Amino acid sequence: MKILLTGATGYIGKRLLLELIYHGHHIVCTVRDKNRFSAPASILNQIEVIEVDFLDFKSLKKIPQDIEGAYYLMHSMSNTHDYEKLEKQSAIHFREFMKGKDVRHVVYLSGITNEDSLSAHLSSRRTVEHELGLGSYPLTT
């Protein structure tokens, strides 16, 4: 299966990449900066590393069209005041990119939330979950 892995430079993304390769998948890793991405030489023939910015919809054209599944592990986690807006826009662009594709499943890594007292970061993750949930693909959060 050809799987899109966003957040491939993060803690979970790096570890998930190896597991997905071990199970025989071809992985398309999207990163903001290729210089921050490293992988064992033994798996380089099973992955594609593509530099994209999910805030720039045009840059998503670099991603292959035949994606069959995806892991959405991106989180801004920046300290800027507008990170919630940026995360929402990234999720919308991801969802729009997936339109018309034969995607079997998307997995989104959110956070454990308490509806009564959400931090700004967890509130942002809930917003992303909502936006991704509007897509035409099955979503697991």
PLM feature spans:
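N-terminal Rossmann NAD(P)H-binding glycine-rich loop of SDR-like oxidoreductase domains
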Residues: 1-30
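NAD(P)H-binding glycine-rich loop region in Rossmannoid oxidoreductase-like domains
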Residues: 4, 35-101, 113-115
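SDR active-site strand-loop-helix element
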Residues: 6, 30, 73, 106-111
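Hydrophobic residues within alpha-helices
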Residues: 12-16, 94, 128
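General small-molecule cofactor/ligand-binding pocket signal
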Residues: 28, 48-50, 140
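A short helix->loop->beta-strand "cap" motif at the edges of active sites that frequently abuts
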Residues: 100-105, 136-137
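Conserved beta-loop-beta element that borders a ligand/cofactor-binding pocket
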Residues: 110, 130-141
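Conserved catalytic-site region of short-chain dehydrogenase/reductase
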Residues: 112-123
